[in-house]
Each structure stands twice: as C-alpha cells, then as structure tokens.
Design a protein with these regions (language model features):
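Alpha-helical transmembrane segments of multi-pass membrane proteins
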Residues: 21-29, 33, 146, 150
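Membrane-interface interhelical connector segments
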Residues: 44-71
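Internal alpha-helical transmembrane segments of multi-pass membrane proteins
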Residues: 93-108
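Short, small-residue-biased leader/transition segments that mark boundaries at the very start
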Residues: 2-5
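Alpha-helical transmembrane segments in multipass membrane proteins, preferentially the mid-helix core
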Residues: 80-91
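C-terminal transmembrane helix-loop-helix hairpin of multi-pass membrane proteins
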Residues: 109-163, 168-169
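Short amphipathic alpha-helical coupling elements at transmembrane boundaries
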Residues: 7-18, 22, 57-62, 86, ...
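Transmembrane alpha-helix/helix-exit interface in multi-pass inner-membrane proteins
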Residues: 30-52
Length: 170
C-alpha cells in the first residue's frame, strides 16, 4: 500500500499529507508486527545456546555499530530491490511468476546484506528482549532513522519517480 500511495502522490492523485499519514500508520503497524513476531520467536528458545542466537546477536550488534553512510547506502539499494520485487510481481501473469519475482527481489537484499527498516525492527526487538545481546535503544534508533531515510530515498528517487516519468511519456 505504501508504494502504491507514493506513486499516486507523485502523480498528484493523493495529497502528500495523506501519504505521510499512510507512511506513519504503515511504519507503526510494521513495528507492532515486528514486536509480536519477535516475541513469538523468543518463545522458541532458539536464542538459548543455538547458532541461530549467535547469528542474530552478532547481526544486531553489527547493525547498530555500522557507519552512517554504509547504512544509508545499503538501505537505498535494499528498497530498490524490494520495490522492484513488488512491481515485477505485479507485472507477472501467473501466481507462480508473482511468487518467484517476490522471492528473488527479497532474497537479493537479504543475501547482499542490505538494510531494511522493517526487517531491522524484528532483529532489534529480538536483540532487546535477549539479555545476551549488547544493543541499546539509542543504537536501535540510530539505525532505524538512517535506514528508514535510505529506504525512502531508494524507493522514491530510484524506483517510483523514474517509473512515473516513464509512464508520463506514454
């Protein structure tokens, strides 16, 4: 929904005020979903002496320790992958094609180590709930502020705006 309303805002069909309201509601809804998901994940016991726990702890610490420009650049590339995955999926004719395009786009950002604010919300909630993870609320806010800005820039400037300009010429 966020991507669609952004496209409609660029076209002038929806006010930017309404777009910002939708962004805020989506962001908070994603945060709530991340907290619930992390809470359920913590009930699995996978953080207790498991390789998964070690991986998640190390990833959370790395995410709050990364340099600002590194986070910003990774976030730009991440949302380019995510937006293209969604748009390519929309263009597919079959359900299998839609699913494969979505998986391909998301796996591209995951395997590349790019930064996505919503994915990070879940990582960080797990990290904050786990006493063995050395992250702070300040570190989480540092990451989410930079990554959210990079995700927005990547999606708006490098996907939505060019797509709008191409459509406008047709």
């Amino acid at each position: 929904s966020e991507m669609c309303i952004r496209d409609r805002s660029i076209k002038g069909e929806v006010s930017w005020g309404k777009t910002i309201k939708v962004w805020i509601v989506c962001y908070l809804g994603n945060l709530l979903g991340s907290v619930v998901t992390a809470g359920i994940f913590m009930m699995t016991g996978l953080m207790n002496g498991q390789e998964v726990g070690t991986f998640l702890r190390n990833a959370a610490v790395a995410k709050v320790s990364a340099a600002p420009m590194e986070l910003f650049a990774k976030a730009i590339f991440c949302n380019i992958c995510v937006c293209l995955a969604v748009w390519c999926s929309i263009k597919m004719k079959t359900e299998t094609g839609k699913i494969m395009m979505a998986i391909l786009g998301v796996m591209t950002f995951v395997t590349s180590g790019y930064e996505h604010s919503v994915a990070n919300m879940t990582f960080f909630t797990i990290g904050l709930l786990d006493p063995g993870t050395a992250i702070t609320i300040g570190g989480v806010l540092y990451n989410l502020l930079i990554v959210t800005a990079g995700n927005m820039l990547g999606g708006i400037l490098f996907v939505a705006l060019p797509y709008y300009l191409i459509q406008k010429k047709d």
